[in-house]
Amino acid sequence: APGTYPYVLMNYTDDLESLSTLAHELGHSMHSYSTWESQPYVYSDYSIFVAEVASNTNQALVRDYLFRTVPDRDFQIGLIEEAMSNFHRYLFLMPTLARFELAIHERVERGEALTADAMMALMADLFDEAYGGEVEMDRERVGITWGEFPTHLYANFYVYQYTTGISAARALAEGMLTGGEEAVARYTAYLRAGSSLYPLDALKLAGVDL
């Protein structure tokens, strides 16, 4: 909340995945802190749509720094694997969960019951479609994926914003790494904007037109 220090709530296990997660969560914290320091109370919050951009931009910048400064081959392979796992999560898993969420809302609106078996079958079908039938799946294991994200699915239509977030973040990180101080200034202005701008306008301020 405004007037307090931002906090990060996570389990840190001293590995690359935890480091990446810490970078992600610190992106949220710095976004909040920058907004609180720059905006009046009425504009001191921001939407999830822009929040997931700041967190993923932080991750992208940390990965680039580590890739350039740690020459160890095994470490770099691990870094690439972590990045690809993150892209899979946000470009395949989250859009599929978003489709699942829409489908179960539509079923409820039609008066249909939601059973665990029906939801697992739907989840597995959506993943099979997402992978184009090219991946052999354990349908029972994949089908329960929705059960791993209760906090996200209880916040209506949250998860698709991870996909837009990482897409915008990659563009912004690349812009700052190649565009110098002007790109950094645009990004900093976006972090400070809070809800004083509509989400798409805030991203335009940063340098991304979605």
Can you describe what each PLM-predicted range is?
Residues P2-A23:
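Short pre-active-site segment immediately N-terminal to the catalytic Zn-binding motif
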Residues S18, Y46-V50, Q76, H88, ...:
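Conserved acidic
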Residues S20-T21, S32-N56:
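Post-HEXXH active-site segment of zinc metalloproteases
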Residues L22, M30, T57-A60, R68, ...:
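C-terminal, non-catalytic "cap/extension" segments appended to globular domains
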Residues V42, L61-Y65:
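Extended, non-catalytic scaffold segments that flank or surround catalytic motifs
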